[in-house]
Amino acid sequence: MTAFQQLPSSVLQTGAIFLSIIIEALPFVLIGSIVSGLIEVYITPDKVYHFLPRNRWGRIFFGTFVGILFPSCECGIVPIINRFLEKNVPSYTAVPFLVTAPVINPIVLFATYSAFGNSFHIALLRALGSIVVAVILGIFLGFFWQEPIQKENRLACHEHDFSHLSPVKKVFQVFVQAIDEFFDTGRYLVFGCIFASVIQVYVPTRILTSISATPLFAILLLMLLAFLLSLCSEADAFIGASLLSSFGLAPVMAFLVIGPMLDIKNILMMKNYLKARFISHFITIVTLVVLVYSLLIGVIL
């Protein structure tokens, strides 16, 4: 205890903020990991394909909103999308699912609601932002994109077929998948919590004030931060909430909306399965739509 008392107060404050953020976030990461394990073991692309509407618009909106029923963390969403495409689920259904599934599911929405002090409107704004991006991407792919988005000689997807397992073994595999997901996500969460706590303690308030005074720059900065941190969608709301007082609502909303869509690990996984031309269009559309959406929030709210 004496050793801790000898540490500078700034270090102790950083540690306290770090612990407060991570303790709030971990239960949601754990729940999300278990749900992800359930989906991995029990939900197959064939089952989803049977429920697809017949018309193009219906399929765009199906892909946009089906994530409410089948929540999936963005950490493993790209291989799932690859399997959908291989089962002839159209790209204008699969890609909107990629964008919204990590955001509009009940776990992430409740995590966002809790992180911002039981704020329903921030959770709603986040969901609305991801829906807008998903619909625009779906329209682009459904009506303007004329080629497959998958690579012809793509790397083999690391998948497992659990359909032949007994019920007991399936339950066991759910926990195996959940544990793997939890620890994979946890390392990104720890880094993000450290970063957020260091910013609050060591970055001078005048610097943060000058950044937030220029909305466009603040939005772009937090979009870049979301890309670099590569946080799990069950946990990023707690990091975003810790940045709200420093940057304001519009930049934090950009952070929350773009994070599950564009980050380092997702882009690297996309390169394994999807064409570079599509990825460049995807990055451009997502970035522009999130930027405009966040600027509008700054103007209206």
Where are the regions that the model predicts?
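Membrane-interfacial helix-loop connectors
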Residues: F70-L128, V203-L274, F278
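Interfacial helix-start motif at the membrane-water boundary
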Residues: E24-A25, G63-L69, L228
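Short glycine-rich loop/turn motifs that provide flexible caps or phosphate-binding loops at active sites
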Residues: I31, F62, V66, C75, ...
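Membrane-embedded helical hairpins/re-entrant loop segments and their flanking transmembrane helices
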Residues: S36-V66, L208-A213, I239-G240
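Structural signal for the C-terminal ends of transmembrane alpha-helices
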Residues: L38-I43, Y202, I264-K265
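Short helix-loop boundary/capping segments at the starts of domains
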Residues: E24, F28-I31, E40, T44, ...
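Selected transmembrane alpha-helices and immediately adjacent juxtamembrane segments
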Residues: T2-I34, D46, H50, L124-M223, ...
